[in-house]
Amino acid sequence: MAEITASMVKDLREKTDAPMMDCKKALTEAGGDMQKAEEILRVRFGNKAAKSAGRVAAEGVVTIAISPDGKSAAMVEVNCETDFVAKNDDFLALSAALAEMVLTQKPADVAALSALPYKNSTVEGFRTELVGKIGENMSVRRFVRLDGQGKFASYIHGGKIGVLVDVTGDEAIAKDIAMHIAASKPKSLDASGVPQDLLDTERRVAIEKAKEAGKPEAMLEKIAEGTVQKFLKEVTLLSQPFVKDDKQTVEQVLKSKNSQCHGFTMYVVGEGIEKKVSDFAAEVAAAAKV
């Protein structure tokens, strides 16, 4: 059996970025053949990736890229299982690169993005290797690419909330509006963007509450309309009190700066993903089976 030296392990680790112990095991299995050991690691990481694929990836980051002229922008959400991995340098570098790829190469969907070249492989190939190295599932969840009427401003809060806002006019106020959106989480720019079924639900609830309170039948529609209007002010960007000056609405602030907001997009990491909950004993039992 060939002697496995520390230098060989180091060289294989530098080539594959795999953990030291995995490198040593692969070299031993390959009888010291570096190329065969590298192939073993690729297979092993692939197997690890397959094991991780069924686990819920509800943490992660949002990354943004904006063209030099500010007219186009892209935003990507990449998920992983734990916040610890969301801070991994390779994971963050991949996530940032994906936003640039979406901006410049305009892939049609996640599958097309995953097939693009990245670091002597493809996005999907690198993702699979990274899953194997880290031992956690990760996935490109969604992205958006936008062409604006004005210029895009952006805001990312802790890597977890990302906002793109399209504004004509004052660039400083555009940045403030992006921060406002992250804090207040409006559902749409104005009333025209709020789904009718959402308004119908608010109206029905308001009528039922008014009935239970003993309000006269003749007043029910008026009460419901008042409730809906209040709801619209709470969930539409232009009607919301501005976070930096709640005596003015966002619309009033924009007008005071001779600016106009054309639209926005917000991503919240893990939004809509059901996180798997398990107790400590179950986690230990699951780990013992791996």
UniProtKB/Swiss-Prot annotation:
Residues 82-85 are annotated as: Involved in Mg(2+) ion dislocation from EF-Tu. The keyword Cytoplasm applies. PROSITE patterns: EF_TS_2. One of its GO terms (cellular component) is cytoplasm. Keywords: Cytoplasm, Elongation factor, Protein biosynthesis. One of its GO terms (molecular function) is translation elongation factor activity. Associates with the EF-Tu.GDP complex and induces the exchange of GDP to GTP. It remains bound to the aminoacyl-tRNA.EF-Tu.GTP complex up to the GTP hydrolysis stage on the ribosome. Belongs to the EF-Ts family. This is Elongation factor Ts. The lineage of its organism: Bacteria, Pseudomonadati, Pseudomonadota, Betaproteobacteria, Nitrosomonadales. The gene is tsf.
